Design a protein with these regions (language model features):
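Domain-level detector of nuclease and nuclease-like folds
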Residues: 68-80, 85-265
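N-terminal Sec-pathway targeting helices
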Residues: 1-9
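Aromatic-lined ligand-binding clefts that engage carbohydrates, nucleic acids, or primary amines
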Residues: 21-78, 195, 215
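Hydrophobic membrane-insertion alpha-helices, especially the h-region
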Residues: 8-20
Length: 265
């Protein structure tokens, strides 16, 4: 009976917190603001997306993943924030782009600025890989992944295409499918077929699921191709920690049990 009352109490707290969060959550308005938030989201497990290198602040530990610079050691050691769906893909067909390129779109087209700052589309990347990939699309390539040492990213400059390592192909696909739906981007039947195949072939990882929840707490929504998110969880941990710290004995045990039951709902 007591446990049920505690669960009911926690449910009320969760709904109150969720209601407040739904009002307070505001997606970043600029790419610069989005990059600052992205750094915080990825700080607990800092790995570059395409190569799996560890990094600290803006410096990449190339030895941690056996990365060998292809051409530019200086840029290779620098961390950059990469749009998986390139800004060019998002904006090049818009009127603002035709008038003045990306900068003009950022300053004058709110729809483009929102897509440019979407945290679901931002990943940490080695600067050289980011530059080499440019605005190339993704696809399968018949080439040995040896351009960057043990990093298994492949860039074919002649074909203007890149092939990500297997570990992130599913994530790439789900980001592309999400961005296409969210911002009504054009996608060829061939690309859709590829991304749907990758989505099926490479299931969502726990890391990807966790990131989706964290990003949702900053954006106000998740990537549905990754899975459901609980906005009520955003900031709820801090509330519960305070309650648990202030409780003692049997009450503390009851709160823990009730929280577990609530999280399973």
């Amino acid at each position: 009976m007591v446990a049920k009352k505690i669960v009911s109490l926690l449910s009320g707290i969760a709904l109150a917190v969720a209601g407040s969060l739904l009002t307070d959550i505001e997606p970043p308005e600029t790419f610069g603001a989005a990059k600052k938030i992205a750094r915080e989201i990825h700080a607990d497990d800092p790995l570059t997306f395409y190569c799996g290198c560890r990094y600290r602040d803006n410096r990449v530990d190339l030895a941690s993943c056996g990365y060998q610079p292809r051409k530019s050691p200086q840029r290779a050691s620098r961390l950059e924030w990469e749009h998986v769906v390139p800004a060019w893909v998002i904006g090049h067909q818009r009127q603002c782009w035709k008038k003045g390129g990306r900068e003009h779109c950022t300053a004058n087209d709110p729809a483009f600025a929102a897509a440019e700052a979407d945290l679901h589309n931002l990943v940490p990347a080695i600067g050289e890989v980011n530059g080499d990939r440019s605005n190339f699309g993704f696809g399968m390539l018949n080439r040995k992944p040896d351009q960057y040492g043990r990093c298994r990213m492949v860039v074919d400059f002649q074909a203007r295409k890149a092939m990500p390592r297997e570990e992130v192909r599913g994530a790439v696909a789900r980001i592309y499918l999400y961005m296409h739906d969210r911002y009504r981007l054009r996608m060829s039947p061939q690309d859709r077929k590829l991304y749907e195949a990758w989505n099926r072939q490479y299931p969502v990882s726990e890391r990807e699921r966790r990131r989706n929840q964290e990003v949702a707490c900053q954006m106000g929504w998740g990537n549905p191709y990754v899975g459901e998110v609980g906005l009520w969880r955003c900031g709820f941990g801090g509330v519960m920690t305070s309650l648990l710290d202030g409780a003692g004995g049997v009450m503390q045990d009851g709160l823990r049990d009730a929280l577990k039951a609530l999280q399973q709902r």
